[in-house]
Amino acid sequence: RGILYAKYQTGSGERKKKNNAVASVPKNAATGASAKASSEETNKNNFAKNAVDGNPRTRWCAAGGGAGQWLKIEFKEAADIQNIRILWEKNNAAYRYTVEASSDGKNWKQVVDQSKNKDVKQITPHKIDAKGAKFFRITFHGSSTDVWGSLWEFEAHTGPLPELPRKVMKAA
């Protein structure tokens, strides 16, 4: 968890030194995690690690459009994940996918099934219950426009999803 602080000024312009907590931000356990994929679009630097680097301007992309491409994320430590959010590359495709969670990387529990998804959404939030999760696997099952499995960012939060910056929301 993180806490945002703000300093305030009085009407006379005097700055108060006291910090006041203004919001509690849930931890994104995926940021800085390790990531592996079934394939990567290496000629364009679209590596698996980009999906968890906290930068919405870098992305992972599979090296081909076939179903069955996957992205596996391993957190530094296990966490009780309540919400995930995927920021897909394209805003004009209905991505079909599943998400699984695991505490050991061997035994998987499906937490999201969008394998028959028909909704066109670039940003897909999901409320889940994945206690003690250390691994997540996103499996791409295709899309409505035959685009490849490709996402800007995968987020996994221990609390409510924070709002996305307006710039990101506008792009979606």
Say what each PLM segment does.
Residues 2-19, 39-112, 116-172:
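Aromatic, loop-rich ligand-recognition surfaces of beta-strand-rich domains
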Residues 22:
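Aromatic-Pro/Gly-enriched surface loop or interdomain linker
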Residues 35:
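Extra-cytoplasmic beta-strand recognition segments
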Residues 26-32:
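Boundary/junction segments of secreted and surface-exposed precursor proteins
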